[in-house]
Amino acid sequence: MNRSFLRPGISFVLAAVLLLSATACAAHEPVLPPSRWGEMQINSMFERYYSISDAFQAADAVARVTVGDWQGEDLRNWVTFFDASVQESYKGELPRNFTLVQGGCSEATSPDYPLFTSGTELLVFLRDYDGSGEKYHPITDYNTVLYVVYDEAGDRYFLDSFGTMSAQDTCVPGRTTPDSAQLAEMTADTDPVLAEAISSQAKDCDSGCCAYAESALEDYFSDLAKQ
């Protein structure tokens, strides 16, 4: 019978390396922004608002992403940087992991638009921030950011909490306008700060916020990509 053995020293070192690796993974704590809200509120002015179809055509990339660690902020330009990972790409060639640039910082944020935090899921219409191909920002900031939410059955939706995109294009398939009870259900698993902001914005939005079923919007994106 042939037998092979690791020398005791090698076996011990291997076990130690595996233990350290497991400990390091378990010990990682998300890096969060110092505050989700700025010290003052700013009301942004935009040259135009985009429909979903217009934003898709104008974007360098469109993707469903998950926000990771807070990287830092640029107080001169009032922007904040986050790690982000692509979960599903609908247009463009985003790196699997990239830097997401959000308007707002610890000094100033827009009403009902808190800074992202680790775990936030988004559908974003992006442009290259600085030409590096590594940093991207939403075309008109919160106007082209849809939050990922889920209904009671676990089906995924993209929520236009400000109603600005849906107001420009009423013919997008899979569109629904949740009432307050449905909205509370959809944001039940969202972090409390964001859930409260969405609820507040929904009350202020005359047309109400709209949600799009993932499957219908993906088919719509596929059609837009062929144009």
Predicted regions and their residues:
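Bacterial N-terminal signal peptides
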Residues: 12-21
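Beta-strand/loop nucleic-acid-binding surfaces
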Residues: 95-113
